[in-house]
Amino acid sequence: MRRFGSKFASGLASRCALACPLASAATAPAGASTTSSTSSAQKSFFKTTEMIGYVHSIDGTIATLIPAPGNPGVAYNTIIQIQVSPTTFAAGLVFNLEKDGRIGIILMDNITEVQSGQKVMATGQLLHIPVGAGVLGKVVNPLGHEVPVGLVTRSRRLLDSTLGKVDTGAPNIVSRSPVNYNLLTGFKAVDTMIPIGRGQRELIVGDRQTGKTSIAVSTIINQVRINQQILSKNAVISIYVSIGQRCSNVARIHRLLQSYGALRYTTVMAATAAEPAGLQYLAPYAGVTMGEYFMNRGRHCLCVYDDLSKQAVAYRQISLLLRRPPGREAYPGDVFYLHSRLLERAAMLSPGKGGGSVTALPIVETLSNDVTAYIVTNVISITDGQIYLDTKLFTGGQRPAVNIGLSVSRVGSSAQNAAMKGVAGKLKGILAEYRKLAADSVGGQQVQTIPMIRGARFVALFNQKQPSYFMNAIVSLYACLNGYLDDVKVQYVKFYEYLLVHRDLGIMYGTAKNKFFYMYVQELNYLIRFFTLNSPILHGELEEMLKQHTHLFLQHYQSKMNAIKSEKDVKALKNLLYSCKRAV
């Protein structure tokens, strides 16, 4: 064994990114320097590595091993090394232990170089990956290797000296705390009707090209605005896990996050369609491991899994290659456990455990709006609610295309603050009556009752291309709820909101009192006081401001819009309204 160690060590300086996490997990303390942990890990690795057999056969990304006589054995879910050359190794994960002694291995690295007859060494270590602040702002793969932005090859550099075990259990009941603090997405329809709390698991489900990824990425971007208003130690950390996506999609999302300054708080984990099925299977667990590092230190983390349908397909592929018995839709019998042990790791910890949280936003793709499919029903039963995106609403121009009737949040108003709760409570009743009246009047004359008038304007306010500020959403919905938009035509509702929430334009609407309002409306504490009985003066000023704004809007804008007749003016108006819709 010493002879093997000296022979292998000479060529492994560039390959220690994988060996170090595996071996140093049990010995390296948190926060140890990279140099010291690397050297000690190499020594520990070669002392504990033992040859256990040879590669017998290879089937895709699965290798079958024949144990050598007198081998010390190998444990399930541990890492093995296959010697593909005198100085190069391929990594694998023990995934099947058969009665005849054969061992099924998921290959994760250097797959094309693995051949029958090559020696296999056991490390005796579970998979560990780098975690901590060092992974923020980077694109990594499930093994913790940084991926260049071009996504052509992956480097072997160890990102951080702190390591986290990928396969861990979920926090127990005693360690958890009730979900009672909101995580704002920036979309009015979600934050009012389907609120998400920190520590919750909210499924995003819908057909292809209905905006599922858009909602998840926009939620990450919205956290940047919130992080800028709070202390850095309370900033929300985001982990975006891409499973089975095209490399171009991952690069596009990376550029989008970079343009909004979100990479400072975000890690992108990429297990693209070009990666082995084993890495696509491991990606969500590696992502939540990075999130748990921050949760255990009292921080708040958002994990997006895009999407779990492709992880289930990768797991099915692995199981079939390992000759495991297929079940419904050829998935193995433990596919439910595949997702439950992942999503149960999302939690809000109790104050005694630091008070940190991991919020999970899994994405699942449906086929022809079928929410009764196997994987879809499994994940729905695990999560605390779902946001259902409708193809008809999407093709009709609604953004986000949230079907409020089929969407639900089991946390409810307990994850909303006083301001949002005061608006959302009445809003739900109006929208429910609006949907009922709209369904009854299909093909006939619609009776213009208050629920019909305000419901149509609420739907217009819910249509937004990008996240909006929390305080702007509250004021807009409050104006609609109290009848200030009743006389505003539906096609001009977004223009009304645009002028209302922009300070530079809003100041043009009148008095010094309005100017004062726009100065302090940006303060969250003031906004919450609008909807309490503790500050009737501020509440009255808000009412007066909305009254003046509506009067001047109807007088100076809507009347002029109705008088427009020339094609040039109509085109200019359409461009103006389109730009306003995109802005809010």
Swiss-Prot record:
Phenotype of gene-disrupted mutants: RNAi-mediated knockdown of the protein in procyclic, insect stage cells impairs assembly of the F(1) component and slows the proliferation rate of procyclic cells that are cultivated in vitro, both in the presence and in the absence of glucose in the growth medium. ATP synthesis by oxidative phosphorylation is dramatically reduced in procyclic cells.
Binding residues for ATP: D207, R208, Q209, T210, G211, K212, T213, S214, Q464
Record carries keyword Ion transport: yes
Cited PANTHER family: ATP SYNTHASE SUBUNIT ALPHA, MITOCHONDRIAL
Subunit-level organization: F-type ATPases have 2 components, F(1) - the catalytic core - and F(o) - the membrane proton channel. F(1) has five subunits: alpha(3), beta(3), gamma(1), delta(1), epsilon(1), plus the additional subunit P18 (Tb427.05.1710) that is not present in F(1)F(o) ATP synthase from metazoa. Subunit P18 (Tb927.5.1710) interacts with the alpha subunit with a 1:1 stoichiometry; the interaction is direct. Subunit gamma is part of the central stalk. F(o) has three main subunits: a, b and c.
Similarity comment: family membership: Belongs to the ATPase alpha/beta chains family.
UniProt protein name: ATP synthase subunit alpha, mitochondrial
Source species: Trypanosoma brucei brucei
